[in-house]
Amino acid sequence: MDYLTHKLLDPTRAKSCIQSIQRDQSLWKDGKSTAGLYASKVKNNLQLDKKSKVSIDNSNLIIKAIISDLLVKSFTIPRKVHGVMFSKSSKGNSYGMHLDNAYMSTGRSDLSFTLFLSDPGEYEGGELAIETIQETRKIKLPQGHIIIYPSTTLHSVEEVTSGTRIVCVGWIQSYIPNNEDRKILFSLDAGAKGLLAAHGQSHELDLVFQSYNNLLRRLGG
């Protein structure tokens, strides 16, 4: 599995976040200011001033939710969640195909995430399009759900044709930089935890957890 979709926030918390960041419209700036040289040419949206108190406070709440979620932790093995920002797209806005920078001022981007804050019934279009070798997957998730995918992936945001799409985006620097290594560890962790839940602790399972942690040591970067 190259990407993870998961309910991170309940709809009430997502709505509360939207109300908070929408209170002062003067804090929303041209999104081109946070894009790289190439990406800025295809970026057409608004972003909340990252230095504002409301952005910092809500970013910290979302970072806390990410690093405390057991499934997300197992999938990402996070060293650092960084570059968190809030994006707003209204009718006519889009973000063309691009690749996230490998290194940012806040850290290395191993994984990218989009947390859907708006109810999908409140806007048309605005799907996150992730390009794979064989196809382009278009993703539009329920309110409060997150998608996490490798930052090595080309992706875009389809044009919003009506309503307003508000999301939180950011990056994760993992203890395991390589995507294939993370996938192996994720499967091993899921299998071991499943066996523990089904059969309880055993010496054989201790050996599996030992191998998992020793792989973390060997593959960590």
Swiss-Prot record:
Its EC number is 1.14.11.-. Keywords: Dioxygenase, Iron, Metal-binding, Oxidoreductase, Vitamin C. GO terms for molecular function: 2-oxoglutarate-dependent dioxygenase activity; iron ion binding; L-ascorbic acid binding. 2-oxoglutarate binds at R165. Fe cation binds at H98, D100, H155. Its cofactor is Fe(2+); L-ascorbate. GO terms for biological process: DNA damage response; intracellular iron ion homeostasis. Residues 80-174 form the Fe2OG dioxygenase domain. NCBIfam families: PRK05467.1-3, PRK05467.1-4. This is PKHD-type hydroxylase Pro_1271. It comes from Prochlorococcus marinus (strain SARG / CCMP1375 / SS120).
